[in-house]
Amino acid sequence: MFVENLKETINLGSKFAKQLNPQSIVLLKGPIGAGKTTFVQGIAKGLSITEDITSPTFSLSHHYRSGEIPLIHLDLYRLENVSSAREIFFSEEEEAIQRQAILIIEWPELIEPFIQNFWKINIGYAKNYGRHYEIRDPKNLLTFS
């Protein structure tokens, strides 16, 4: 699916949020600046979260509790080894289970082999401008492209 601008990215994220349930896991992949956090802002909008959504690159995770379903936003970009990434992921996953939250993970490459039953979103730069989104459901079926 082609997305031309920030507004369309927010709208796509908001629509996508309606597919999610408590304890859904979403893996977000894409290069730096592709719009991963903007897409998460759209998901938060779709969940009626009123807090400002910012990138958790330096803090590793942000927790949002004001919406219909709580949201945990994890960013593993700064982590360099699998054991650290796994430790943080499993801790945040436990929190998501306890709070019935959705867990969204940016830069999930180190932990993807250890996770089952997740949504996978690949964001890429389109040829001249905009972004291309490929969204796969937990059964690995293409839902948007």
Region locations from a protein language model:
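Hydrophobic anchor at the beta1->P-loop junction of P-loop NTPases
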Residues: 26-28
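N-terminal pre-Walker A segment at the start of P-loop NTPase domains
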Residues: 1-15
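Phosphate-binding P-loop
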Residues: 17-23
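Conserved lysine of the Walker
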Residues: 36
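Short phosphate-coordinating micro-motif centered on Lys-Gly-acidic
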Residues: 83, 91-145
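Short beta-strand-centered segment that lines the nucleotide-binding/catalytic pocket of NTP-utilizing
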Residues: 49-64
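The conserved Walker
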Residues: 32
